[in-house]
Regions:
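Conserved AdoMet/S-adenosylmethionine-binding subsite of the radical SAM
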Residues: 1-11, 20-153
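Conserved strand-to-loop "acid loop" that flanks and positions the catalytic carboxylate
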Residues: 17
Length: 181
């Protein structure tokens, strides 16, 4: 399939539940690169060492990193011990690599109405910016493809998200994107 796409595509983004969890990711990235494509990775950052290894091996040219909440609220959002430390360490890995000419990256936060993600969004963006990231996206959660166990709409929610986006954009990013639902 990819061989037929040469000249039509610039790259392939490896994603899934968590791309970096896959033991064969580095080998898959090498194959994609050998076919002449760039490689991107979507991650929530639970494997900072594996991310560093991929970067140092030259196997990734772009990363989309989800930072879900402030460190003190991460467990509430993802329900896993050490998730905050690992995600924020992955951000450090990306910032350090970018300082050495490493891959481009985007940090994004997805917000859900009535959830700590919405309460934290502007402060998360401030801390991400202070850490050295320069490309950021605020995303409204969407119901498509979910179990329906949480509400992604609420009265006034769109307006709240637009105001969050304005405050976050004002932090001075090289590129800021707001992705409404």
């Amino acid at each position: 399939l990819l061989r037929r796409r040469r000249g039509l595509l610039d790259g392939v983004v490896l994603t899934g539940g968590e791309a970096l969890r896959q033991d064969a990711l580095a080998d898959a990235a090498r194959e994609v690169i050998d076919m002449g494509f760039q490689v991107g990775v979507h991650t929530a950052g639970p494997y900072p060492r594996r991310l560093r290894d991929m970067i140092e091996a030259g196997l990734v040219s772009w990363v989309g990193l989800d930072i879900k909440a402030l460190p003190e609220h991460y467990g509430q959002v993802v329900g896993r011990a050490n998730a905050a430390a690992r995600a924020w360490e992955s951000l450090e890995v990306l910032v350090e690599a970018a300082g050495r000419g490493g891959p481009d990256f985007e940090v994004r936060t997805t917000v859900v109405p009535g959830d700590v993600t919405a309460d934290d969004a502007v402060e998360v963006a401030r801390r991400v910016h202070a850490a050295g990231a320069r490309v950021y996206a605020l995303q409204q959660a969407r119901s498509e493809g979910t179990s329906g166990e949480f509400d992604v709409v609420a009265p006034g929610w769109d307006g709240m998200c637009e105001r969050m986006a304005e405050r976050i954009e004002a932090l001075g990013w090289d590129r800021f994107t707001y992705r409404p639902a």
